[in-house]
Swiss-Prot record:
It is a multi-pass membrane protein. This is CASP-like protein 2U4. GO terms for cellular component: plasma membrane. It comes from Selaginella moellendorffii. PANTHER family: CASP-LIKE PROTEIN 2C1-RELATED, CASP-LIKE PROTEIN 4A4. Glycans are attached at N137. Homodimer and heterodimers. NCBIfam families: A_tha_TIGR01569. Residues 47-68, 136-157 are extracellular. It is found in: Cell membrane.
């Protein structure tokens, strides 16, 4: 008979905890960097959008005249606060000598918060992009004239802020993917 004559195959020894924690620490480092990127981009989105103002003769265009731009700044501020808090917590966990994987409850909270903020930022960026499109091209059906030829500085700054917000969405989405990995990679016995 062969090597497997009905007897159970020998079981592999469990991997050491140090070997198991290495990928988690590496992912935590990536998450840390992505959250730092999200913080910086959120600051830039807010700073550039808040300075999107222009006056031409008696007319003026300001970012706070539009609910879509106000929503983008508000959501960016919330993402800034959340990403900064997560950055601090991730840095603490990464530098801690007694580092261990987050609990299942903590992983769920991170995953849900990351998902909510990623989609909120995506929605705010999309609404602002639609408004910018109308400002640039107008709307013949609504009989709205394009304003970017008159308010070029305003439109340029608003557009830059919108581009930065979509880049922030990418950073938040990648952070969210790492949160999902931390949550769903766990075996069911660790619930």
């Amino acid at each position: 008979m062969g090597a497997y004559d009905g007897a159970e195959a020998p079981r592999a020894a469990p991997a050491s905890t140090a070997a198991n924690s290495r990928p988690s620490r590496l992912l935590l480092l990536h998450s840390l960097l992505l959250r730092l990127v999200a913080v910086v981009l959120s600051i830039l989105v807010i700073a550039v959008m808040v300075h999107a103002k222009q006056r031409v003769m008696i007319f003026k265009a300001e970012w706070d005249n539009s609910k879509a731009f106000v929503a983008l700044v508000t959501i960016s501020a919330i993402c800034l606060g959340y990403s900064f808090l997560q950055f601090i917590l991730s840095a603490f966990h990464l530098c801690s000598k007694s580092w261990k994987s987050p609990t299942k409850c903590w992983a769920w909270m991170n995953f849900i918060a990351d998902q909510i903020l990623t989609y909120a930022m995506l929605g705010a960026a999309a609404a602002a992009a639609e408004l910018a499109y109308i400002a640039k091209n107008g709307s013949s059906r609504a009989q709205w004239q394009p304003i970017c030829s008159t308010f070029n500085t305003f439109c340029t700054r608003a557009g830059a802020s919108i581009i930065l917000s979509f880049i922030a969405v990418l950073a938040l989405a990648n952070s969210s993917a790492i949160s999902a990995y931390h949550l769903f990679r766990r075996p069911s016995s660790s619930v």
